[in-house]
């Protein structure tokens, strides 16, 4: 195997070679069997996962688990068809059986040969000891107990607190018939706090979380248990004094950071190549055309150190990259994996992702955000006579085919005469993603990424992602609410 000296990454494949007896010869045999029926391409995806989860509810440990899993998924492509089989038994016989099963998607004599392996050069975005995390639960438990104590101390109206911690260490090895060879060790941690506040007969909720591709050392500053607990409690207490949200079409200002989830959902999914190849996206066929305000530039960047959505290599063994999707309002391209790149002739953007070895890869976002502009957040707010300032979001729904969305704002305020006034409750933003981008008239210089809590679902698969944006102003958007 050719291992380019230019790559700064350590090699992680020894884990699978030593623990499971995997060899390069076995990889070549499996790929050969996968191509034997005439497939165009085949790949192997080995995964070994160690996961830990802890939960405290009302100061009582309600859940605690640690587990490991391992397996291999084998994929064969034949034209536009995909054959896939997986096994949690990494013995030679079961791997070869899975390869032959995946090969059934094709029919005919072998027409492709396995090329010599060349390791993918990639960055080292989240260095971790190859021995993995210390499995002692005491330090993890103390984190969530600190969060519980801080939330309760914030205000006597906080009547219920739940805190949880999750952690995984994922090791992968990828070998493909086109010679791609990659391995990685991927840490991921997340701390969440949920609270309920009550005053008289009114109950409100608040939540906050943080995490990323690092260990416990990341839970300091804005991600400390105390900071997250205070943020969750602040949100719940704020809602106790909120007024009903106004309804109608108005100017809307989105705050920096987590509001980027609206960009991710209402626009980002529509820029994934599989939807566009099948012409089920509102952005299909629009490359080179104006799809947003000239102030809007949107990128997807899988190379941000330590971020929740970052990857040294994607789940097909390709290096991740920064991909410009919309530049100055003009659509520049889509997020592609190997299949969509091969079928459309586009470049592979290293966006092939999957939930686990039991799932096929598909084009997915990593860290998606709008670039900063030149406006100050203060000037943006001052420019609004009457409108809504939305700084945090809960759930939402999006129709990829037309870009229509409905999002609930978990924290929002009235803007009156250029000033933030009363907090509002039950505000929803209703619109169309591509259309909304055309109404962006001001973009702040305060780009911020989320705290590392995003999880994205698509076709039954969930993967960690990051989102972000600066403060932006939309000249028109429909707001749903019960106030005036």
Model-inferred region functions:
Residues 1-484:
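N-terminal small-residue-enriched
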């Amino acid at each position: 195997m050719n291992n380019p000296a230019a790559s700064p990454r350590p090699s992680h494949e020894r884990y699978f070679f030593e623990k499971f007896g995997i060899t390069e010869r076995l990889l070549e045999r499996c790929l050969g069997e996968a191509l034997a029926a005439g497939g165009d391409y085949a790949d192997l995806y080995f995964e070994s996962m160690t996961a830990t989860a802890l939960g405290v509810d009302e100061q009582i440990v309600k859940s605690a688990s640690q587990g490991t899993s391992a397996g291999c998924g084998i994929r064969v492509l034949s034209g536009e068809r995909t054959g896939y089989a997986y096994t949690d038994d990494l013995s030679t016989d079961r791997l070869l059986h899975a390869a032959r099963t995946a090969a059934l998607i094709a029919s005919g004599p072998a027409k492709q040969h396995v090329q010599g392996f060349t390791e993918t050069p990639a960055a080292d975005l989240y260095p971790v000891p190859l021995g993995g995390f210390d499995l002692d639960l005491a330090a993890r438990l103390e984190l969530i107990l600190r969060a519980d104590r801080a939330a309760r101390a914030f205000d006597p109206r906080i009547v219920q607190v739940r805190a949880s911690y999750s952690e995984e260490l994922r090791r992968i090895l990828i070998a493909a018939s086109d010679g791609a060879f990659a391995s990685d060790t991927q840490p991921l941690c997340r701390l969440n706090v949920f609270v309920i506040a009550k005053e008289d007969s009114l109950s409100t909720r608040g939540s906050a979380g943080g995490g990323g591709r690092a260990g416990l050392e990341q839970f300091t500053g804005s991600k400390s248990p105390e900071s997250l607990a205070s943020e969750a409690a602040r949100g719940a207490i704020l809602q106790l004094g909120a007024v009903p949200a106004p309804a109608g079409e108005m100017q809307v200002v989105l705050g920096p950071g987590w509001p980027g989830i609206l960009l991710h959902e209402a626009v980002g999914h529509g820029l994934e190549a599989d939807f566009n190849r099948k012409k089920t996206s509102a952005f299909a066929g629009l490359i080179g055309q104006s799809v947003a305000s000239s102030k809007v530039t949107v990128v997807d960047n899988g190379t941000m150190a330590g971020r929740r959505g970052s990857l040294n290599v994607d789940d097909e063994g390709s290096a991740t990259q920064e991909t410009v999707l919309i530049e100055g309002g003009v659509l520049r391209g889509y997020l592609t994996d190997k299949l969509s790149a091969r079928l459309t002739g586009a470049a592979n953007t290293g966006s092939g992702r999957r939930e686990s070895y039991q799932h096929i890869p598909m084009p997915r976002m990593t860290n998606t955000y709008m670039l900063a502009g030149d406006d100050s957040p203060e000037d943006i707010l001052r420019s609004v006579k009457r409108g809504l300032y939305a700084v945090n979001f809960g759930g939402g729904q999006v129709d990829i085919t037309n870009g229509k969305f409905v999002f609930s704002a978990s924290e929002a305020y009235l803007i009156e005469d250029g000033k933030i006034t009363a907090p509002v409750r039950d505000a929803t933003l209703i619109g169309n993603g591509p259309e909304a981008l055309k109404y962006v008239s001001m973009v702040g210089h305060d780009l911020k990424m989320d705290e590392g809590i995003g999880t994205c679902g698509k076709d039954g698969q969930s993967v960690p992602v990051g989102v972000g944006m600066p403060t932006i102003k939309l000249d028109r958007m429909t707001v749903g609410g019960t106030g005036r």
